[in-house]
Amino acid sequence: DNIEDYLNPPKDDATTSASYDNAIYDLTVTDYAKNINDWQFAKMDSYFKNNPSLGLSVKDSLQLGFYYKQLKAPTDTTTFRADSTFYINYTGKLLNGLVFDTTDEKTAKDNGIYSASRKYKPVPVKWAKDYTDIKLDGSTVVKGFALTISQMRAYEKGVGIFYSELGYSYSGQGKSIPGYAPLIFEIELVAKPEEN
């Protein structure tokens, strides 16, 4: 192969012409980082400064890259017994406000992520002694989500904010969560939903 073959592909061979398709991309670098964790901490610091009602700063971390703020006090501060099951409503979003998941139908509709095939209702959480063993509707969750739940007690409402090492890391998740994205989860412990 040489440059002439690449620039002038055969015109009569339909099987090879697709591999010679050209594409032009116009890219703009909007931000860069020498250290991705420092970049995420700076983004979270900016979020805290732009949302002063949270009353958080980067100095308030409970663990590297993890922040929790109680929004409504619990009715009981007793720690859950291992293997207890309780129910939560939650909304997950990015620092820019993009909602990517929720158990609330109105929130889903308001943010363009509603799916008629999904049931919007509180979901069960299985408590565990070690937060990494907490399960949501029988499935494992990212560490930051589990850490947020581990801070909570009966009927409490709170928000967990954490860097990507406690979320989806470099890979992101689906089309909504890019790699290295700090995440926000607003979670409320609620009563078990009525069976229909």
Which sequence ranges carry the predicted segments?
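Cross-family detector of peptidyl-prolyl cis-trans isomerase
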Residues: 1-196
